Amino acid sequence: MLEFYGQKFESRLLLGTAQYPSPAILADAVRASQSDIVTVSLRRESGEARAGQDFWALIRELGVAVLPNTAGCHTPREAVTTAKMAREIFGTNWIKLEVIGDTDTLQPDPFGLVEAARALCDDGFEVFPYMNDDLVVAERLIEAGCKVLMPWGAPIGSGRGLNNPYALKTMRAHFPDIPLVVDAGIGVPSHAAAAMELGYDAVLINTAVAKAGDPVAMARGFALAVEAGRLAFEADAIEARDMAAPSTPLLGKAFL
């Protein structure tokens, strides 16, 4: 069972809530994904505006946990301020921390990220940092108080999948007891399955579902892929090899 900061969840698929064609399709996609956790952006959803109130009512109706994020923040100060506003509006200490360092790739700023994570952890937040796949940055985030890490698979919205499986595999081996979530860049269900086969605890999907021709069907596809990938990891899959190995025994074979 998936566990974040002492809370347990059945599904290992986290779903973003931005860019869907309509609120109804969003709701159907969340149900199809069987996700227990959805991410929301304070910059997109105001708890005071009517649209924000309608969105919040929809999320409550779905009965899922909410993980607010600091999307669009480029400085530690901006991210910390946004996180505090999110806590007031959504009533949770959880925060998906994003501090963007490059506008073209949306790559996280590792220095600003660690600074903001330290400030938020000291203030009682339970931080989910969106990060690159650097082990040293991961160490600094853990030292700052983070108990979950969210390395990217590829740039946000790119759909490229896992750009550096070696780095992700190394991070999994280096932090066997820290919940790890692949966040960003996943484009199709097979990418999610590959992440789960590496031993990752969960994946976070948004654009790949929201922008699909049929978001509801894609959400279901991701749910199945995440389950399949996790089962493969737990089943201890065979190692790849360069040469063939016969799978059919010779015992009882007729000699001609």
Swiss-Prot record:
Gene3D superfamilies, alphabetized: Aldolase class I
Q: Where does this protein act, in terms of pathway?
A: Cofactor biosynthesis; thiamine diphosphate biosynthesis
Q: Which Pfam families match?
A: ThiG (PF05690)
GO annotation, cellular component aspect: cytoplasm
Show the catalytic activity: [ThiS sulfur-carrier protein]-C-terminal-Gly-aminoethanethioate + 2-iminoacetate + 1-deoxy-D-xylulose 5-phosphate = [ThiS sulfur-carrier protein]-C-terminal Gly-Gly + 2-[(2R,5Z)-2-carboxy-4-methylthiazol-5(2H)-ylidene]ethyl phosphate + 2 H2O + H(+)
Which is an annotated GO molecular function term of this record? thiazole synthase activity
Which catalytic residues are annotated? K96
Keyword terms, alphabetized: Cytoplasm, Schiff base, Thiamine biosynthesis, Transferase
User: What is one Gene Ontology biological process annotated in the Swiss-Prot or TrEMBL record?
Assistant: thiamine diphosphate biosynthetic process
Q: Where in the cell is it found?
A: Cytoplasm
Instruction: Kindly list the positions annotated as binding 1-deoxy-D-xylulose 5-phosphate.
Output: G157, A184, G185, N206, T207
Chief location category: cytoplasm
Which EC numbers does the record give? 2.8.1.10
* Protein family: Belongs to the ThiG family.
What does the annotation say about its assembly with partners? Homotetramer. Forms heterodimers with either ThiH or ThiS.
Task: Indicate what this protein is called per its UniProt record.
Answer: Thiazole synthase
> What is the protein's species of origin?
Brucella anthropi (strain ATCC 49188 / DSM 6882 / CCUG 24695 / JCM 21032 / LMG 3331 / NBRC 15819 / NCTC 12168 / Alc 37) (Ochrobactrum anthropi)
Gene that specifies this protein: thiG
